[in-house]
């Protein structure tokens, strides 16, 4: 089973054996912490590779340069921010308001050879300069755009969304101007990757 997972990641995302071993360490660390603080639901932890690793790493399909600054909002258990960092994104900022989750992220960040900064604060309190914003399971699109109005985002947002994506886009367009592209998630037929440029 693990060999098949490695082969998939290696063929599709050029994941080395060393990087794959870091993902396995990530699973062990997450399992340990999840017993004391609720980072992910127990059912999704059982499906760690598809639900969390594949779901996060697929964003690399829409990132064409790893030498960038990525701001990951509401990082929680580190998806997708930590996964992208372990996969070679040079500079990742993890933003998490919950101090317990930020403590977990501090440990998870040690698995990466790249630069990771952890900011334990609310998104709306920050002025962040980055190339790309990533978001997974945080808030509706209108809230995300409102909370990041003071950000300087050079390129785009990549937001993992579920089946209500169209309603969220319609509502957000009432108060915001942006262009968007939708991509089907490779992990779930009812999930989408929303690419936004403002």
UniProtKB/Swiss-Prot annotation:
Record's keyword annotation contains Cytoplasm: yes
Single GO cellular component term: cytosol
EC assignment: 2.1.1.170
The keyword rRNA processing is assigned to this record: yes
MF-aspect GO terms: rRNA (guanine-N7-)-methyltransferase activity
SUPFAM superfamilies named in the record: S-adenosyl-L-methionine-dependent methyltransferases (SSF53335)
Coarse class of the protein's main subcellular location: cytoplasm
Disulfide links within the chain: none
Residue ranges that the Swiss-Prot or TrEMBL entry lists as coiled coil: none
Catalysed reactions, as listed in the record: guanosine(527) in 16S rRNA + S-adenosyl-L-methionine = N(7)-methylguanosine(527) in 16S rRNA + S-adenosyl-L-homocysteine
Annotated localization: Cytoplasm
Keywords from the UniProt entry: Cytoplasm, Methyltransferase, rRNA processing, S-adenosyl-L-methionine, Transferase
Residues the record lists as binding S-adenosyl-L-methionine: 74, 79, 123-124, 136
Function text: Specifically methylates the N7 position of guanine in position 527 of 16S rRNA.
Family: Belongs to the methyltransferase superfamily. RNA methyltransferase RsmG family.
Name listed for the protein in its UniProt record: Ribosomal RNA small subunit methyltransferase G
Organism (species): Orientia tsutsugamushi (strain Boryong) (Rickettsia tsutsugamushi)
